[in-house]
C-alpha cells in the first residue's frame, strides 16, 4: 500500500538519524507503515527505542524494546546515540 517514493523518503530520513523512537500502542499491531519503518531502522542498524504511548497499553512488538513514556527514558535513549 506504500509506494516506493514514500519508502525511499522514509529510508533516507532513517539513515540520516542517530536513532528512531517508535510510539507503541495496540494499533501498532495492525499498522503496516509503522512496522515497515521499524524494520527499516533495524535493517539500517539505526538504534531503535520503543516508547509505550499509553500507560494502560503495554503492547509488545517483535524486534522492539519498549519502555514507559518518561522524559528520563527518552533522555537516556537520546544520550545513548
Where are these regions (language model features)?
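C-terminal interaction surface of TIR/SEFIR-family domains
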Residues: 54-81
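Conserved TIR/SEFIR loop-to-helix hotspot centered on a Trp-containing motif
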Residues: 26-44
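Short beta-strand/turn micro-motifs composed of small residues
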Residues: 24, 52
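A short, aliphatic-rich alpha-helical micro-motif
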Residues: 14-15
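Conserved acidic residues
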Residues: 18
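Conserved BB-loop
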Residues: 1-10
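A short helix->loop->beta-strand "cap" motif at the edges of active sites that frequently abuts
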Residues: 43-51
